[in-house]
Amino acid sequence: TWDNYRGQVDTGGPLNDSGTIRGRAVVTEQTRQYFYDVASRKDQIYYGALDFDLSPDTTLGLGMAYEDVDATPCWGGLPRYADGSDLHLKRSTCLNTSWNNQRSKRATYFADLKHQFNDDWSLKVAGVYSRNTQDMEYAFPSGAVPVGATASNTLMLGSIYDYDQRDYGFDAYVDGKFDAFGQQHELTVGANASRSHKDDFYAVAALPQRQNVLDPNHHIPQPDESYYLANASRGGPVDMHIKQYGAYSIARLKLADPLTLVLGSRVSWYKSDTDSVQYFRGEGTQVDTKSTETGQVTPFAGVLFDLNDNLTAYASYTDIFTPQGAYKTIDGSTLKPLVGQSYELGIKGEWFDGRLNSSFNLFRTIQKDAAQDDPRCEDSSCSINSGK
């Protein structure tokens, strides 16, 4: 297990005699080493939740989660000879430095309110806030090794990253059942919104000392922040604001006892604003970008046919629309949204009151402009839109 140790305490239950107040608390800690050099990781996770029955029909839930990670990661992979052949390095080889460090903390607070109007209709309202901070510094090799070399003089790239992101989310929906044309149908109608603010700084620079990947030195001198600013091939501060709003509905219409038609749609609004400075060899260039999508409609349709009490055949279609404003190009601008279509055909089964489930599915997904790493950025810090 490579010195992998994990402990967890998980407790919960009613907190009063009537059971109208319930709670759960979880504490987890894990420390581990790895089979490759240098790397290690320590995780601490805390979770707590309370449920309050305000009335027989209304329940309020409150909770929080916290995660703290302190790691020395091994990033960047292993190079090859210039002709693409294997270097035959030891399985334990890591070419990073001992001062590689990742420190991240995430705190999440959430609340939800559920109300049952009657046997058929209910309301749920939920909100969440989270803050994620990360401080990282790492070095990794870049470039191939000359064929037949017994030593190498491989370029080492260093990177620093200071990250602070705050996210707010809200969702509310009503769902229920209604009778029409001699059948019972289901309907869900809702709306949601989210807001995100990311404030970060990063820089990537070639380190003064190179690496012999055939005999790694894990103690290459660690530069200070001023070195990165003066020698950065790219980097700088980034201040990003993203807002999303949407309304959605889905109806499950019973056309006959074995046949159900599912129709749904979402209307989305999206806006992102990014202010950044791109550094190159100590010189900074201001880059400001904006992205807006208004009233984007994403439909969904499906049909289900009950073959018997256990098996259901189905087919579905949906449009794909995913904003990608969080991805930035090498010049600091944002990517176009990912768009496309998805088709699915299959059979699903359920036995023993849901204790055993099975499915067989065929998918066809067509995507355009999905984000992918830009090969001009060795540390995968920038992206480009892919083709179709």
Explain the meaning of each model-derived region.
Residues T1-N4, E29-Q33, K42-Q44, Y66-D70, ...:
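Transmembrane beta-strands of outer-membrane beta-barrel pores
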Residues Y109-N132, M156-V277:
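Face-selective signature of the C-terminal outer-membrane beta-barrel domain
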Residues D51-S55, Q165, Q184-S196, V238-Q367:
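Structural signature of Gram-negative outer-membrane beta-barrels, strongest in the C-terminal barrel
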Residues T11-D17, T31, L54-P56, A111, ...:
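Outer-membrane beta-barrel proteins
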Residues D3-G7, K42-Q44, R103-A107, D164-Y168, ...:
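Residues that define the transmembrane beta-barrel architecture of outer-membrane proteins
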Residues Q30-Y34, Y47-Q116, R131-Q165, Q209-G235, ...:
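Acidic/polar loop-and-plug regions of large Gram-negative outer-membrane beta-barrel proteins
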Residues D112-Y138, D306-D309, A313-Y314, P337-K388:
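Membrane-embedded beta-barrel scaffold of Gram-negative outer-membrane proteins
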Residues T1-G48, L54-T58, A107, F352, ...:
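Outer-membrane beta-barrel translocator/receptor signature
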